[in-house]
């Protein structure tokens, strides 16, 4: 079996395992609301509804629609707004949260438009507001927000080259988060100063929150040097689009700031937890 087929088979097994997780039950265990107090035990969050401004639910990933549907059922009229982004064919009916679909694993224009819609939703929230971010496998490819001047075509080409070379999900996400603006803590930054609680269903062995869906609400533990090392490992230095090379090289030189680390003050208003994963499924 060649490496590309082995990688594809591994992803199929991961997808099957994630599908076997009782997504709604995982969310129901993790978000509890009695009409007065909101409890989110995995993230050690508890607050009276009267102490929260807007409650916004965001769900991104292949399990996003089921997660969003359960969250809106739990919250009822306490839900102020929401947004769901999932893979084509994975959507389902929700009461109040709009559902968008986009391509996976190679990003497309629908993912780009959805990312802009999501950013607009969380921009302007206050410190009294709460964002509940529900993350699942596939979120990295779906949430497409390339850093200028990188365009969608360049991002698609880079993803295609890495996949064809046999890069694993960890390697792919290290590169992605250094080329985009909502990964590597970028979503938490966009939502600031609102409080953020991120709940993830993991498709990554070891459950690293900064790797699952490229860590949109998590501090980053990788660097531009790590991203470039992935490119070099697969001999892609001369094949990548010039805008991608320029972005990574600028990061190596320090002319682009590094992604925020876990101890960055940005994450003082963020809590996160894995609520289901492959071993427990």
Where are these regions (language model features)?
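N-terminal loops that bind phosphate or other acidic moieties
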Residues: 1-281
């Amino acid at each position: 079996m060649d490496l590309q087929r082995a990688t594809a088979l591994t992803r199929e097994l991961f997808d099957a395992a994630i599908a076997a997780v009782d997504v709604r039950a995982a969310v129901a265990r993790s978000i509890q609301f009695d009409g007065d107090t909101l409890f989110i035990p995995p993230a050690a969050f508890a607050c009276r509804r009267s102490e929260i401004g807007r409650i916004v639910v965001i769900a991104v990933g292949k399990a996003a629609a089921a997660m969003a549907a359960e969250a809106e059922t739990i919250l009822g009229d306490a839900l102020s707004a929401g947004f769901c982004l999932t893979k084509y064919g994975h959507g389902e009916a929700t009461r109040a949260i709009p559902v968008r679909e986009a391509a996976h694993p190679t990003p497309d224009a629908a993912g780009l438009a959805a990312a802009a819609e999501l950013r607009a939703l969380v921009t302007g929230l206050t410190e009294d507001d709460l964002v509940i971010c529900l993350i699942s496998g596939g979120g990295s490819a779906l949430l497409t927000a390339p850093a200028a001047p990188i365009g969608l075509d360049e991002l698609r080409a880079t993803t295609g080259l890495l996949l064809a070379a046999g890069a694993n999900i960890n390697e792919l996400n290290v590169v992605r988060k250094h080329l985009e603006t909502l990964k590597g803590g970028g979503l938490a930054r966009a939502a600031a100063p609102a409080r953020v609680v991120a709940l993830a269903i993991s498709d990554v062995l070891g459950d690293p929150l900064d790797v699952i869906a490229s860590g949109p609400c998590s501090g980053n533990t990788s660097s531009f040097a790590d991203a470039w090392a992935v490119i070099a490992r697969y001999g892609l230095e001369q094949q990548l689009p010039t805008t991608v090379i320029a972005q990574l090289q600028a990061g190596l030189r320090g002319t682009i700031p590094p992604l925020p680390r876990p101890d960055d003050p940005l994450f003082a208003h963020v809590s996160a937890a894995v609520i289901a994963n492959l071993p427990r499924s």
